[in-house]
Design a protein with these regions (language model features):
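Amphipathic helix/helix-loop-helix segment enriched in hydrophobic residues with interspersed Lys/Arg
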Residues: 1-290
Length: 290
């Protein structure tokens, strides 16, 4: 079924519409297509040449044609970081479509940030001290990608607390500081994973893996560069077993620095990517490598 859908999509600019026709959806059904992290298409467009550039444009045309036709009730939502909106002009018709339906998501205010902190802790059946809550609120900062950093810091604080304290005690500042705080938690965690390498050679190969899947743009902005596992072996010069061991180490549960998730089996065609751009901004070692 997937192969048939792919063939339909590749047939023409109306591929999405045709796929909807061939589906088992009711005639009057609404179909919502959501493309998250759309800015990755710009990275793909810039770092691949020839047919890949054509694929990027074709993908955009599929979305535009589906959204603009009236035969089927197809709606398209794309999400992207606001600093990439200008890149939409690379594709004919995309900037116009974005202008017609743009919605800028405002940053969370302090009350919303408080809820984002307390909610997961409450779901886990625990509490945090008022001192830690205020410390977290003050440490979050204003960077657009700071929420994933907060999420990671909370996860690490929770992990440290659950291993070292009676679960009747609330999460406190001491637990938070033990994992490096907001500023260093992610970087410290990544360095701990790096330190688990079997040898200095494997640390070198780890550096080469991350150098292969990340880069800096002309504006010094970190750019993800997803790469197939087989290509990573060629780029790093490391054997297949070593590269898989490196990738697995950085994607175990509670350590999701690399994608795909841990439950996905790896093959030479598996695309390896970092889980979030914030890793390029926060991990000190990676900033030094790239």
């Amino acid at each position: 079924a997937i192969g048939q859908i792919r063939a339909t999509l590749n047939r023409s600019r109306l591929g999405l519409v045709e796929a909807a026709r061939q589906s088992e959806l009711d005639e009057d059904a609404n179909l919502l297509i959501v493309v998250d992290q759309f800015e990755e298409l710009f990275r793909f467009h810039q770092t691949h040449k020839g047919t890949s550039n054509e694929q990027a444009g074709f993908f955009v045309n599929l979305l535009l044609e589906a959204a603009q036709q009236s035969e089927k009730r197809i709606y398209v939502v794309i999400t992207m970081r606001s600093d990439f909106v200008g890149d939409c002009a690379q594709f004919r018709g995309l900037a116009e479509a974005v202008n017609e339906g743009e919605y800028l998501i405002p940053r969370l205010n302090r009350k919303q940030r408080k809820a984002a902190i307390q909610g997961p802790v409450k779901v886990g059946g625990a509490q945090l001290t008022d001192q830690l809550l205020h410390r977290l609120l003050n440490d979050i900062g204003d960077d657009p990608d700071q929420l994933p950093v907060l999420q990671h810091a909370l996860m690490r604080t929770w992990s440290y607390w659950s291993k070292n304290e009676d679960n009747t005690e609330p999460l406190g500042v001491l637990h938070y500081e033990a994992i490096g705080g907001m500023e260093r938690a992610l970087s410290q965690h990544a360095d701990e994973v790096l330190a688990d390498a079997h040898s200095e050679e494997e640390k070198r190969d780890t550096r080469r893996v991350f150098q292969a899947i990340t880069e800096k743009g002309g504006d010094n902005r970190g750019i993800r560069r997803p790469t197939r596992l087989g290509e990573l072996c060629q780029i790093t010069g490391a054997d297949h077993e070593t590269v898989i061991r490196i990738i697995d180490r950085f994607r175990v549960p509670g350590c999701t620095f690399l994608m795909p998730p841990n439950e996905v089996a790896l093959t030479n065609d598996t695309v390896i990517d970092i889980s979030h751009e914030s890793l390029m901004r926060v991990w000190v070692s990676l900033k030094r490598w790239v």
